[in-house]
Amino acid sequence: MAQTVTTEVETLGDVLLRSAADDPEREALILPDDRVSFAELRNRAFAVARSLAAVGVRRGDHVAILIPNSVAYVEALFGVALLGGVAVPLNVRHRASELGYILANSEAVALLTSQDAADPVDFPTILLEALPSIGESGVVTEAQSLRHLILLRGNSSGRFIGRADFLASSETVSESAIEQARRSVRLRDPALIIYTSGTTAHPKGCLLCHEAVTRGPVERARYRLGTGAPPVTWGAGPLFHIGSLSPFIGSIGAGGTFLTDGYFEAGRALALMAEHGVTLAWPWFPAIVQGIVDHPSFDPAMLATLRYLFLIAPPTLVDRVQDLLPHAEVIQACGMSETAGIFALCDVAESRESRAVTHGKPAAGVEVRITDPETGAELPDGTMGEILVRGYNVMDGYWAAAEKTAESFDAEGWFKTGDLYTRLPNDSLVFGGRCKDMLKVGGENVAAIEVEAFLCTHPDIKTAEVVGRPDPRLDEVPVAFVELYEGRVVDEEAIIAHCRGRIASYKVPRAIYFMASTEWPMSATKIDKRALRARLAEMTK
């Protein structure tokens, strides 16, 4: 008899409280140098909520969080949720200009940040550069809604209120007052604004409701990927990114333990997973998983408890990881900030061959449509086009960007993802790249991802990224940036020769640029192609 899956929809605050009531002593979060139980996290989150209320933050207010992965980060996240506020996680790698823009655009009334020896940078210094007026008294002129600057890790200094002073204010607000605020939060109320970079000059804030950020992740962790026991989940990425935040929320909702670190280092990650018996891993991106399996200390026996590993990668890498971890199932998926993370994923019952080449099928409660990017007409199965998504998980819109929101939805409420997919007759989805990542070579459409996947069939190539180079005759031609496996040697001509006669001539890269592992320009989680295009433009002036 098939398992009955109950659709349980909760607010973000409720997700924590239920698990804290069910198993208060279980560890909710473990880092190499810190940990917190569900009971402790519940109490810390209430203390943050009470303190925020004490300084004047109210339901619906936006609260920015600029803290690396840590206990402080998650107590801030849930503290804002319990109060009924809207959390605005900030990228800890952003520089002053980016932070200044987001703090102003988001209309955050408070900022929870950190000044700790473990921080990658001195956040108060960068914030002073971003918002010079915080060095003075009065209104923060660069972000006029911002009234409270709080160091959730650190001591009071200037305009910044330190942890001890901030939490002391909680004594003026009762826990019952926060309980009343929590119970008033509705499932479709905003929970998060996740800023995502794209082709626009500034990041766009995706407004996500409580149902969007809890329903799918919790259902997956409890049922679809459930093993009968609370999961032990490892997340490689920063918790300001939906790709890591979503599995974290799922872990909390399933009463599991989430493993992470303030930064990714493969040896530390392996040791953490081995020590705590990881069952579900979310490395997501090729650079992360390659760092794991290529590390000198890697031994499949270290991950003997692993059941599932999520990865988005070319089939050659998926197959390699699956071969190295035969006891686990490698699963691909697709998602983005605008869809609160995953909107489709492979089923564990699918063959490994299918999971290597597809991104699975739409999740429950989510619809997809494949359309012609030019005309918007729906396309038949087997034809590549832009994938549109509609469902409970889709954002309500881009914050304070009505025009961009209108451009991103059609008249029937379908969100235009900008991703290219082909739907197979069995509803599985095959990724074809980004609409804006298509090259036009002499009138022929070339998907960069197709050439990248072929380049990775070369035994010496570890990573490949393809971009277009302007060409006076063909409009543009493909060129490739590649990273070789350590110790391998191959020249440009050999790689180009590998392509000739095996892919169409117009798809063959016209030039190969070799990259060391440390040379790739990175966004929060993946290689930044816009930076590669800028580098190419400089190189070919």
Predicted regions and their residues:
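Conserved beta-loop-beta connector loops within the AMP-binding
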Residues: 367-388, 407, 425-426, 488-492, ...
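Conserved adenylate-forming
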Residues: 55-57, 170-189, 193-235, 246, ...
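Conserved AMP-binding/adenylation subdomain of ANL enzymes
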Residues: 81, 214-232, 240-280, 295
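Structural core segment of the AMP-binding/adenylate-forming
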Residues: 55, 85-165, 488
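Conserved AMP-binding/adenylate-forming core of the ANL superfamily
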Residues: 6-9, 13, 17, 25-70, ...
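Gly/Ser/Thr-rich phosphate-binding loop
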Residues: 167-168, 253, 275-284, 290-354, ...
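AMP-binding/adenylate-forming catalytic core of the ANL superfamily
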Residues: 94-100, 111-113, 391, 396-397, ...
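A short helix-loop-beta submotif of the ANL/AMP-binding
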Residues: 62, 68-88, 92-96, 101, ...
